[in-house]
Swiss-Prot record:
Main location: secreted
Tagged with keyword Secreted: yes
This protein's encoding gene: prl2
Subcellular localization(s) per the UniProt record: Secreted
Protein name: Prolactin-2
Species per Swiss-Prot/TrEMBL record: Oncorhynchus keta (Chum salmon)
Length: 210
């Protein structure tokens, strides 16, 4: 019941945003998107902490490097200073491309979480579903934003996800699950950073305060 209620609230929030989008200014839409991305990143950070609590000792050694994340091929600003020099259209395109690239991986994580060999797999599974809800909600909000910003902001880079199996043994499943979540946390931070820069520009805040 709680799960259904939360999903309904998110759906209603998106519906209200769609219905009233023409009456809402760009800066307000940016603020709403920034709030969603902040929640997405906070939730992914919480999930990584849950996974860390029962991570095998050899996990850090065996876990793939961040450069192996499937989104690493996307050319993006490395820090805030670089992001501040990127155009609004490119930043929104990067944020949407990263978010869209996680649709399939989140489906995989959602299907694997209930049977993950981890004592908190129930909580982890619930949080993964929340991630999916917030990701969908944020994506819908960004679609509204780009419609306001114009055609030049609507380009999306296609980033294929070739993974579909976390492994057969317990250690491999935990390591690969944790690796995917660490990649998502990294990308959710980037999305959040890009949207905060866009919010600052929309509200005409000084760059150093972004």
């Amino acid at each position: 019941m709680a799960r259904r209620s939360q999903g309904t609230k998110l759906h209603l929030a998106v519906l209200c945003l769609v219905v009233s989008c023409h009456a809402i200014g760009l800066s307000d839409l940016m603020e709403r998107a920034s709030q969603r991305s902040d929640k997405l990143h906070s939730l992914s950070t919480s999930l990584n902490k849950d996974l860390d609590s029962h991570f095998p000792p050899m996990g850090r050694v065996m876990m793939p490097r961040p450069s192996m994340c499937h989104t690493s091929s996307l050319q993006i600003p490395k820090d805030k200073e670089q992001a501040l020099r990127v155009s609004e259209n490119e930043l929104i395109s990067l944020a949407r491309s990263l978010l869209l690239a996680w649709n399939d991986p989140l489906l995989l994580l959602s299907s694997e979480a209930p049977t993950l060999p981890h004592p908190s797999n129930g909580d982890i599974s619930s949080k993964i579903r929340e991630l999916q809800d917030y990701s969908k909600s944020l994506g819908d909000g960004l679609d509204i934003l780009v419609n306001k910003m114009g055609p030049s902001s609507q380009y999306i880079s296609s980033i294929p996800f070739k993974g579909g199996d976390l492994g057969n043994d317990k250690t491999s499943r935990l390591i690969n699950f944790h690796f995917l979540m660490s990649c998502f946390r990294r990308d959710s931070h980037k999305i959040d950073s890009f949207l905060k820069v866009l919010r600052c520009r929309a509200t005409k805040m000084r760059p150093e305060t972004c």
